Amino acid sequence: MASLQTQMISFYLIFLSILLTTIFFFKVNSTETTSFSITKFSPDQQNLIFQGDGYTTKGKLTLTKAVKSTVGRALYSTPIHIWDRDTGNVANFVTSFTFVIDAPSSYNVADGFTFFIAPVDTKPQTGGGYLGVFNSKEYDKTSQTVAVEFDTFYNAAWDPSNKERHIGIDVNSIKSVSTKSWNLQNGERANVVIAFNAATNVLTVTLTYPNSLEEENVTSYTLNEVVPLKDVVPEWVRIGFSATTGAEFAAHEVHSWSFHSELGGTSSSKQAADA
């Protein structure tokens, strides 16, 4: 009898070991994905959260009109699992979008436009040069925000000393950790691709103005920076856009947006397609 009990205990221990190993294997080797594609915005776009002056109309997302002192934001409605606390894994992601900055005068444009990653409960921050995403030029780890800015107005307190319009990567501060000078083509559509490689922690930004079918007339800018997302943003985040105006202004519009992320070591997926 004792021998039978011992055999049963051994069997259950072996079974439990196999079960736990199997669960761990599938957890480590599974992938959680989030994907969506918006090729044309609708007036009642259900998968966006609007903040400030952001709204959709006529197939586009308008963050600000060309008027003074406005802040407009739009967030994807579903939180994104950007890294996993149990495994330590971080998601690879790529997002692409087209946007237009259109000002009455190409010389007097403000303030700019961002794509950002922030806590789920994110709210509009300071306007003007802070682009509705940050409140300080000093590093603030409680911000838990990474942004890619397309900055059209020079602020002496934190912008590059060359005073040029620029693309910047911002980590917990409006003062960019890396910048690339950028010649705004007023009223022209820009194509942007932002990609994050979790293996290297490299965030890559590419902006292209395909203003002609002739290859030599395509203007392109690329910016790279190491950004340890897991050390900056929460495990679950929201992604979105923000734009602001000040004493000078411009209309800031997004015409299309897609996003795809893959997080290894989890076991669920979310996909959405929006025409």
Curated annotation (Swiss-Prot):
<dbReference type="InterPro" id="IPR013320">
    <property type="entry name" value="ConA-like_dom_sf"/>
</dbReference>
<protein>
    <recommendedName>
        <fullName>Lectin</fullName>
    </recommendedName>
</protein>
<feature type="propeptide">
    <location>
        <begin position="211"/>
        <end position="217"/>
    </location>
</feature>
<dbReference type="GO" id="GO:0046872">
    <property type="term" value="F:metal ion binding"/>
</dbReference>
<comment type="similarity">
    <text>Belongs to the leguminous lectin family.</text>
</comment>
<dbReference type="InterPro" id="IPR001220">
    <property type="entry name" value="Legume_lectin_dom"/>
</dbReference>
<dbReference type="InterPro" id="IPR000985">
    <property type="entry name" value="Lectin_LegA_CS"/>
</dbReference>
<feature type="signal peptide">
    <location>
        <begin position="1"/>
        <end position="30"/>
    </location>
</feature>
<feature type="binding site">
    <location>
        <position position="159"/>
    </location>
    <ligand>
        <name>Mn(2+)</name>
    </ligand>
</feature>
<keyword id="KW-0464">Manganese</keyword>
<feature type="binding site">
    <location>
        <position position="151"/>
    </location>
    <ligand>
        <name>Ca(2+)</name>
    </ligand>
</feature>
<feature type="binding site">
    <location>
        <position position="159"/>
    </location>
    <ligand>
        <name>Ca(2+)</name>
    </ligand>
</feature>
<feature type="binding site">
    <location>
        <position position="247"/>
    </location>
    <ligand>
        <name>D-glucose</name>
    </ligand>
</feature>
<keyword id="KW-0106">Calcium</keyword>
<dbReference type="InterPro" id="IPR016363">
    <property type="entry name" value="L-lectin"/>
</dbReference>
<feature type="site" description="Cleavage">
    <location>
        <begin position="210"/>
        <end position="211"/>
    </location>
</feature>
<comment type="function">
    <text>D-mannose specific lectin.</text>
</comment>
<feature type="binding site">
    <location>
        <position position="246"/>
    </location>
    <ligand>
        <name>D-glucose</name>
    </ligand>
</feature>
<feature type="binding site">
    <location>
        <position position="151"/>
    </location>
    <ligand>
        <name>Mn(2+)</name>
    </ligand>
</feature>
<feature type="binding site">
    <location>
        <position position="149"/>
    </location>
    <ligand>
        <name>Mn(2+)</name>
    </ligand>
</feature>
<dbReference type="InterPro" id="IPR050258">
    <property type="entry name" value="Leguminous_Lectin"/>
</dbReference>
<keyword id="KW-0465">Mannose-binding</keyword>
<dbReference type="Pfam" id="PF00139">
    <property type="entry name" value="Lectin_legB"/>
</dbReference>
<feature type="binding site">
    <location>
        <position position="129"/>
    </location>
    <ligand>
        <name>D-glucose</name>
    </ligand>
</feature>
<keyword id="KW-0732">Signal</keyword>
<keyword id="KW-0479">Metal-binding</keyword>
<feature type="propeptide">
    <location>
        <begin position="270"/>
        <end position="275"/>
    </location>
</feature>
<feature type="site" description="Cleavage">
    <location>
        <begin position="217"/>
        <end position="218"/>
    </location>
</feature>
<feature type="binding site">
    <location>
        <position position="153"/>
    </location>
    <ligand>
        <name>Ca(2+)</name>
    </ligand>
</feature>
<feature type="binding site">
    <location>
        <position position="166"/>
    </location>
    <ligand>
        <name>Mn(2+)</name>
    </ligand>
</feature>
<comment type="subunit">
    <text>Heterotetramer of two alpha and two beta chains.</text>
</comment>
<dbReference type="InterPro" id="IPR019825">
    <property type="entry name" value="Lectin_legB_Mn/Ca_BS"/>
</dbReference>
<feature type="binding site">
    <location>
        <position position="111"/>
    </location>
    <ligand>
        <name>D-glucose</name>
    </ligand>
</feature>
<dbReference type="GO" id="GO:0005537">
    <property type="term" value="F:D-mannose binding"/>
</dbReference>
<feature type="binding site">
    <location>
        <position position="155"/>
    </location>
    <ligand>
        <name>Ca(2+)</name>
    </ligand>
</feature>
<keyword id="KW-0430">Lectin</keyword>
